[in-house]
A protein has these predicted regions:
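Class II aminoacyl-tRNA synthetase catalytic cores and aaRS-like
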Residues: 1-426
Length: 426
């Protein structure tokens, strides 16, 4: 019991920042067995993980932890409302199912009445939603639990996770894009850290273009940096690490990083990409200096045709078989570190499209499926027949596959399913 009164000093950052309670009587409803708590509740995220899990009921009292659960509830509710508004039916599919080949290992559940046999927990409701499509449910979705026996990733919990799963019958790639471009931006803007999200239509970037321009099929479009292929200039370079290699450069204007900071960032990039990177800069006087400058000075006229080499420009260099991947890491790392090159306060979406249908396998040396073999090849049966007749290179065939990327993170993957047995056989 007590009195609620107005605070003398208000704090607008607190939910109860304008009032306070002056207790008149306190009744203890449950006594603690210990003289002190295992950790401070409002700082539980700083505690040892084992302690947090042991005293999970205390950890969840931390507003920062609790708010994550509340946020998830609000986002899921908003997704349900938006998908329903677009004519989708929420249909819950079975959890206990038969094992089928997927991308990870299955979790198995022993079948009590059938010794030696097992159910599998679904890695994704693929077969069930295909069954729904053939049964006449033309728009399906669910907040689907997915169980995958795989190692933890930086952006995914091990074991299980939930995803917005959807399927559309008689739909084109653009039909799918239209739904998600309408559903996602308002939800990100309302519940996300930033209140600005890309408006529809999102940028469509071909897979090969993404690799050539951004060094990644998950580009962060908030960053204004790109990589340039200058391999031909270094075919006979005096600098052995670049000689005859794939060489990609990223020019960063108005960069004020010190030599020590640059080399620390390059070291971090090397850990991420597994490939050593190099650098040089254009100083205040417009002269090339630092790093590998002495090996590129004679090539400055040619480099200026593809790079901007104004004073105070830093150039970072990736070389070798993994130059593309390394360049992508350089772009994201230096784009975030160099002031003025990253618009952080927004969500920037894009679609990665035109994935190659085939590639040459690293081990087999033969033609193999590049990604999803069950997707529709762009151009259908005719393009496969042209490849069979030798009229086109099979490596030029693209598939109706797509990834949705936001701020350098892959949010989802999808494809137009190959429903034609003749095309599948071919």
């Amino acid at each position: 019991e007590g009195t609620v009164r107005e605070r003398d000093s208000k704090n607008a950052k607190l939910p109860t920042g304008e009032i306070e309670v002056v207790p008149g009587k306190i009744e203890v409803l449950g006594r603690c067995q210990h003289s002190e708590l295992p950790f401070q509740i409002n700082r539980s995220r700083e505690a040892d993980e084992t302690q947090r899990l042991k005293y999970r009921y205390l950890d969840l009292r931390n507003p920062a932890v609790k708010n994550n659960i509340v946020l998830r509830c609000q986002v899921v509710a908003a997704l349900r409302a938006a998908m329903t508004e677009h004519g989708f039916l929420e249909i819950t599919t079975p959890i206990l199912t038969a094992s089928s080949p997927e991308g990870a290992r299955d979790y198995l559940v022993p079948a009590r009445k059938h010794p030696g046999k097992f159910y599998a927990l679904p890695q994704a409701p693929q077969q069930f939603k295909q069954l729904l499509m053939t049964s006449g449910f033309d728009r399906y979705f669910q907040i689907a639990p997915c169980f995958r026996d795989e190692d933890a990733r930086g952006d995914r919990s091990p074991g299980e996770f939930y995803q917005l799963d959807m399927e559309m019958a008689f739909a084109t790639q653009e039909d799918v894009f239209a739904v998600l471009e309408d559903v996602l931006p308002p939800i990100f803007a309302k519940f996300g850290t930033y209140d600005v999200a890309s408006a529809a239509p999102f940028r469509r970037i071909p897979y090969n273009t993404a690799l050539e321009t951004y060094g990644s099929d998950k580009p962060d479009l908030r960053i204004d940096l790109t990589c340039k292929n200058v391999s031909k200039l270094f075919e006979n370079s005096e600098f052995e690490p670049l000689r005859g290699q794939t060489v990609k450069m990223v020019d960063i204007s108005d960069c004020t990083l010190t030599r020590k900071q640059v080399e620390k960032l390059l070291s971090d990039c090397e850990v991420q990409s597994g490939s050593k990177a190099y650098w040089f800069k254009v100083d205040e006087k417009g002269e090339l200096a630092g790093g590998i400058a002495k090996f590129v000075t004679d090539l400055r006229p040619q480099l200026e045709q593809v790079l901007t080499l104004a004073p105070n420009t830093l150039v970072v260099v990736a070389a070798g078989a993994s130059a593309t991947k390394s360049a992508g890491v350089l772009i994201k790392t230096f784009g975030a570190a160099c002031a003025g090159h990253m618009d952080q306060e927004r969500y920037e979406f894009c679609w990665i499209v035109d994935f190659p249908m085939y590639e040459i396998g690293d081990e087999s040396g033969e033609l193999e499926f590049c990604h999803n073999p069950f997707s529709m090849p762009s151009g259908g049966l005719e393009v496969l027949l042209k490849a069979e007749r030798g009229e086109i290179d099979p490596l030029t065939i693209t598939a109706d596959q797509y990834d949705l990327v936001c701020n350098g993170v892959e949010l989802s993957s999808g494809a137009v399913r190959n429903h034609d047995p003749e095309i599948m056989v071919k």
